[in-house]
């Protein structure tokens, strides 16, 4: 056991985590040169296209160190994006140490900080690594000082390497073996294994990634899931070298995969503890704290026949993604679907894209909203995650919106632009600290503004230099209103949005104008209105198509023309009473972009 090292790699987006893992796999001979490819651990097509890591992946390698010993390295590559920070915390729970990778050109960024603090809270040994020293812009001395100044760990003798060229990666491994402590645990004790992650394989059923804390797990053992008490047979187990390799046993301190032929998706929840049925452990390991979704949106299949397939797909996806929340929802405009909760807009986009790709579904998304806390006049507190669930105006005593605490790191040159943006987003500054030429800003900004397009606009005002990390702080009373959209006097529930009263007029007008361009013209006038309660705040009309009924009159008497026009008018009136309007899919997407283009 003293030769096992469990660690994960944490860093900001694009600081080279996945490339460094490629090099480590290559040096330790996990894959032959023929099988080696860039970002070998990003197995999803989506990850490769966007160049980001979404799922954490684990690998077991053997490394012969300079002291002649052979060490078993279990390492986990983690995502860097703020929406996937829960993936990072789950991976860290399985480790004793972490490599903090910092780009020697860019320096410390917000995510570096957030992930590093997560690691320190879990008492992990953090080993700083300066990557990309082959770049002409690299300044390792300055960055080492920055790490010490901002993060607070000693980085004077931090390992310097370039994952792209392979320089210094050997030193990284040596430092790992030296600085990261071996796992603790009792190999003879009753089995306790933590489920770090699980996913669904169409042939094997549920595959779980586990870390053995105490005891030993052998092939063919009867294992018990501690939260549900159900027992399963350990059919196959093994390690990833990144390929799946079968083993006969997993020993104390190791990380590996396990297949128990579990058909039910909820059979082995992430964060649960496995133990042996015949010699169970007394208590479960502390799991992970459940992450609360921050953004909710309705997802509906375009054709209602896909509803069953959509439900199964969501079930399989939620096994792989512990933070996805969903419940059935029906809408008069869109039929049956699900209300889904996500950690942020990127997460929402990724989930929607994965559903469309991996499960071949066509989906419509409604506008994303956040959760509001509503105190009704009867003093009851309810949580509202969709505009249609908001009680009537006269029943609301107080409406509170979620406030996010946003930590931003940015160069001084962009400070003015960023502050202007934060104020426009109704933000309140709580802290500002200068570190060299970097500024650490802390703002409290309403979550609704953060999830709309704050991240994109922060990046564009600061030319991509600012970085953001945000978390939910509290609920705060605020003057929010629901803007309904009426089409020919009928409310369309899927188009409603909740917004601040100050912005409501603009938002309403903008939405109505957008809808006007998207709804095809019919034989009668279509009135599109935005309303708060019964008060109409904006209106536009899609004009009718009409035939020229006067074309056949030659010269002709004025009364003859009037008669024909009058007849046409009456026909249109009758048509309007019975006609209904088909809304194209673009109309629903229009709301997603309200408040974005005109800035």
From Swiss-Prot:
GO biological process, one term: positive regulation of translation
InterPro entries: EF-4, EFG_III/V, EFG_V-like, EFTu-like_2, G_TR_CS, LepA_C_sf, LepA_CTD, LepA_IV
Gene Ontology annotations for the cellular component aspect, listed alphabetically: plasma membrane
Cellular localization per UniProt: Cell inner membrane
Keyword annotations from UniProtKB, A to Z: Cell inner membrane, Cell membrane, GTP-binding, Hydrolase, Membrane, Nucleotide-binding, Protein biosynthesis
Enzyme class label: hydrolase
Record's bilayer topology term: Peripheral membrane protein
Any one Gene Ontology molecular-function term assigned to this protein's record: ribosome binding
Annotated GTP binding sites: 14-19, 131-134
One Pfam family matching this protein: GTP_EFTU
PROSITE patterns: G_TR_1, G_TR_2
Major location (coarse): membrane
Entry keyword annotation includes Cytoplasm: no
NCBIfam families (UniProt xref): lepA (TIGR01393), small_GTP (TIGR00231)
Biological role: Required for accurate and efficient protein synthesis under certain stress conditions. May act as a fidelity factor of the translation reaction, by catalyzing a one-codon backward translocation of tRNAs on improperly translocated ribosomes. Back-translocation proceeds from a post-translocation (POST) complex to a pre-translocation (PRE) complex, thus giving elongation factor G a second chance to translocate the tRNAs correctly. Binds to ribosomes in a GTP-dependent manner.
Family membership noted in the UniProt record: Belongs to the TRAFAC class translation factor GTPase superfamily. Classic translation factor GTPase family. LepA subfamily.
Protein name as it appears in the record: Elongation factor 4
Protein's organism: Escherichia coli O1:K1 / APEC
